[in-house]
Amino acid sequence: MKINISELTVKPIDISYIPTLLEIQEETFRHAGGSGDFLRRNTYETLAPCFEEPSVVLGVFYKEQMIAFGILYAAGQTKENLAYDIDEVTDVRENANLKLSIVRPDYRGNGIQQLLIVRLEQSARESGFKWISVTVSPDNPWSLNNCKACGYTEVKRLEKYGGLVRVLLAKKI
């Protein structure tokens, strides 16, 4: 569905939206044919910590319906922090993960993922982060291209999340 990006509302959302995030995630899995390699399946428990500051979760709304969301996750010194795999990052606490960015299938192709990336970068800068990193399936050229269009560079390919091959990208902000 073609929409005008100026008709969208992007705003921080709270933990009460997790059921909607999971619904959008499952819609994406169904659209992708159920491939578990394309996207890591998250649960309520894996998403809940993303709502703790300084992490940020943004929802994108069109006519009052959430059509997309993005998560900037401050993983700190936990094993979730992608900075451990990036040699240039000397202090992992300076990195935030772009954990998830999902657009409902009917609304793809409108620049929404790039809009989310830019807004999440802004939040990261305001919180004092120096780096943002993200992993993307090599079978997801759309997200790879969107990240690269936003200035992210490929660091390496590696196995994450129980053996899934991912492209690690990073950007100094």
Predicted feature residues:
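A short beta-loop-alpha structural element at the N-terminal edge
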Residues: 5-23, 34-35
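Active-site rim helix/loop that mediates acceptor-substrate recognition in acyltransferases
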Residues: 35-63, 71
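Conserved acyl-donor/pantetheine-binding loop and adjacent beta-alpha core of acyl/acetyltransferases
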Residues: 69-100, 161
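Conserved beta-strand-loop-alpha-helix junction that forms the acyl-donor binding cleft
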Residues: 108, 134-144, 162
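Conserved active-site alpha-helix within GNAT-family acetyltransferase domains
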Residues: 114, 126, 138-156
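C-terminal "cap" of GNAT-fold acetyltransferases
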Residues: 150, 159-173
